[in-house]
A protein has these predicted regions:
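NAD(P)+-binding Rossmann beta1-loop-alpha1 motif at the extreme N-terminus of oxidoreductases
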Residues: 1-56, 60, 83, 120-123
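Hydrophobic beta-strand scaffold residues
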Residues: 30, 48, 110-112, 153, ...
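Residues in the short beta-alpha loop(s) of Rossmann-like NAD(P)-binding domains
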Residues: 35-36, 67, 135
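Rossmann-like NAD(P)-binding element
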Residues: 51-80, 85-95
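Rossmann-fold dinucleotide-binding core
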Residues: 91-171
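Helical "substrate-binding/catalytic lid" subdomain
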Residues: 161-216
């Protein structure tokens, strides 16, 4: 049974801590690690393990670090439990994802990318959207975990496709943000109040996550 298996979260910042707490509150056998010692001081409920032990003992490892460049440097350093699963929740380059997968597959370790959208609020409330580079059947045993941390989970079939989807997602978000900046400047040049602009957009077809959450 999955709840009897050791699950670990590497990276306990705002996103990772939210994910850890979701699983901790449902009584999973969960451990954590973060390079920042203050995380341990300020979160006494977290069961900490050093990286060597996490890789040695864990059945499932959730990686919530800045990018998979950090992951590649770490996995070459430690021996990883055979038949364990690494779920990469970072926003990363797909070619690096494929490189990591090729390395780990030779060691009988499964690795999948599962990029996140929803921010720290989504991690805390379990309402993330996950973009997964795998077939759904490959992660059936972890459905309970995925359902606890995400409201929407999409499977794209092959390793790297989850991270590719996140890059497309971010490109749209950043593009809309830049356009909103330009439109805001143009509105001010036309003597239109920025607050009025955003209020109008948010109740019309021009509304977006960016206009609702990032402006003014």
């Amino acid at each position: 049974m999955l709840k009897n298996q050791i699950i670990s979260v590497i990276g306990l910042g705002r996103m990772g801590l939210g994910i850890y707490n979701r699983l901790y509150n449902k009584n999973f056998n969960i451990y954590g690690y973060d390079i920042n010692p203050d995380i341990k001081i300020n979160n006494s409920h977290i069961k900490f393990l050093e990286l060597e032990k996490i890789f040695e003992l864990s059945h499932l490892i959730l990686l919530v670090v800045p990018s998979n460049e950090e992951i590649y440097s770490v996995i070459k350093k430690y021996k990883i439990k055979m038949n364990s699963v690494l779920l990469d929740l970072t926003t990363s380059m797909p070619d690096q994802t494929i490189k990591i997968n090729n390395y780990l597959s030779k060691k009988n370790v499964e690795y999948f990318d599962a990029a996140m959208s929803g921010g720290a609020t989504g991690a805390k409330s379990g309402t993330l959207t996950l973009m997964v580079g795998a077939k759904e059947s490959q992660l059936t045993q972890f459905k309970m975990v995925l359902d606890l941390i995400s409201q929407n989970t999409f499977f794209y079939g092959k390793v790297g496709s989850g991270h590719a989807m996140k890059l497309l997602h971010n490109s749209v978000c950043h593009g809309i943000f830049l356009m909103m900046c330009e439109i805001g400047q143009l509105a001010e040049e036309l003597d239109i109040n920025l607050d009025d602009l955003i209020e109008t957009f948010n109740v019309s077809n021009a509304r977006s996550f960016i206009s609702e959450q990032r402006f003014p």
